[in-house]
Amino acid sequence: MKRSKAYRAAAEKINPENFYSPLEAVRLAQQTSTTKYDATVEVAIRLGVDPRKADQMVRGTVNLPHGTGKSPRVAVFAAGEKAAEASAAGADIVGSDDLVARIQEGFLEFDATVATPDQMAKVGRIARVLGPRGLMPNPKTGTVTLDIGKAVSDIKGGKINFRVDKQGNLHIVIGKTNFTDTQLIENYTVALDEIVRVKPSAAKGRYLKKITFTTTMGPGIPVDPNRTRNLLDEGAAA
């Protein structure tokens, strides 16, 4: 794959053999962004788990204190009073059978979904569409609930879902390149703490095997997986 001149110039600032601290990686991500807009800062984590085994699945939710820098579009499966509650909370799309039908026809212009329990039989008809995209409502992530207003508000306020893929990789967005160092570090710390907290008891050996920071269309920045504590102190002292 041929890389752009801007990408190659950015990549030259990064030593792929070096492990950077999270603060160094945040600053490099901001410096090596190759887009003309505020790029997304993403973290890719290789976990020491076997996702093929049910007792080693890693998934969860976390509320980023500074959000992701993007207002996610939320689709809600609800009817009656709960539909009105969802709309009042800021849901972008609200529906029931009609929303299911739209999705069956190819509509996917949303970033997250929420559903009331009574709607799940209908949502099940599009599980093969939503599931692979990480968009299926799930009670474990608080997206199948009667408290629709809170669920929508949480997502709009910076709540994100994470789930390890078949290769043992997990991807999370921690903000934009126009965030301050402290905002990105705080988001990263909160997310990483939650990922560590939900480590499966069946997982053996090193859990955090590899961590890489990157920006939209930017080069990867290897981060020391052992630097998981005192990140805020590091940020304050730098």
Curated annotation (Swiss-Prot):
<dbReference type="InterPro" id="IPR023673">
    <property type="entry name" value="Ribosomal_uL1_CS"/>
</dbReference>
<comment type="subunit">
    <text>Part of the 50S ribosomal subunit.</text>
</comment>
<keyword id="KW-0694">RNA-binding</keyword>
<dbReference type="GO" id="GO:0000049">
    <property type="term" value="F:tRNA binding"/>
</dbReference>
<keyword id="KW-0810">Translation regulation</keyword>
<dbReference type="Pfam" id="PF00687">
    <property type="entry name" value="Ribosomal_L1"/>
</dbReference>
<dbReference type="InterPro" id="IPR005878">
    <property type="entry name" value="Ribosom_uL1_bac-type"/>
</dbReference>
<dbReference type="GO" id="GO:0006412">
    <property type="term" value="P:translation"/>
</dbReference>
<dbReference type="InterPro" id="IPR023674">
    <property type="entry name" value="Ribosomal_uL1-like"/>
</dbReference>
<dbReference type="InterPro" id="IPR028364">
    <property type="entry name" value="Ribosomal_uL1/biogenesis"/>
</dbReference>
<dbReference type="GO" id="GO:0003735">
    <property type="term" value="F:structural constituent of ribosome"/>
</dbReference>
<keyword id="KW-0689">Ribosomal protein</keyword>
<keyword id="KW-0687">Ribonucleoprotein</keyword>
<keyword id="KW-0820">tRNA-binding</keyword>
<dbReference type="GO" id="GO:0019843">
    <property type="term" value="F:rRNA binding"/>
</dbReference>
<keyword id="KW-0699">rRNA-binding</keyword>
<comment type="function">
    <text>Binds directly to 23S rRNA. The L1 stalk is quite mobile in the ribosome, and is involved in E site tRNA release.</text>
</comment>
<dbReference type="GO" id="GO:0015934">
    <property type="term" value="C:large ribosomal subunit"/>
</dbReference>
<comment type="function">
    <text>Protein L1 is also a translational repressor protein, it controls the translation of the L11 operon by binding to its mRNA.</text>
</comment>
<dbReference type="InterPro" id="IPR002143">
    <property type="entry name" value="Ribosomal_uL1"/>
</dbReference>
<dbReference type="InterPro" id="IPR016095">
    <property type="entry name" value="Ribosomal_uL1_3-a/b-sand"/>
</dbReference>
<comment type="similarity">
    <text>Belongs to the universal ribosomal protein uL1 family.</text>
</comment>
<protein>
    <recommendedName>
        <fullName>Large ribosomal subunit protein uL1</fullName>
    </recommendedName>
</protein>
<dbReference type="GO" id="GO:0006417">
    <property type="term" value="P:regulation of translation"/>
</dbReference>
<keyword id="KW-0678">Repressor</keyword>
